[in-house]
Swiss-Prot record:
Record-stated family: Belongs to the cyclotide family. Bracelet subfamily.
UniProt xrefs under InterPro entries: Cyclotide
Protein's name in the database: Cyclotide glopa A
Organism in which the protein naturally occurs: Gloeospermum pauciflorum
GO biological process, one term: defense response
Length: 32
């Protein structure tokens, strides 16, 4: 759903620390 925040933040590289997280427009990673 993209509403659960992950610890990781992102700029260009995407999200890698937590599987299933994706980069959103606020430069933070959220669980899909």
């Amino acid at each position: 759903g993209g509403s659960i925040p992950c610890i990781e933040t992102c700029v260009w590289t995407g999200c890698f620390l937590v599987p299933g997280c994706s980069c959103k427009s606020d430069k933070k990673c959220y669980l899909n």
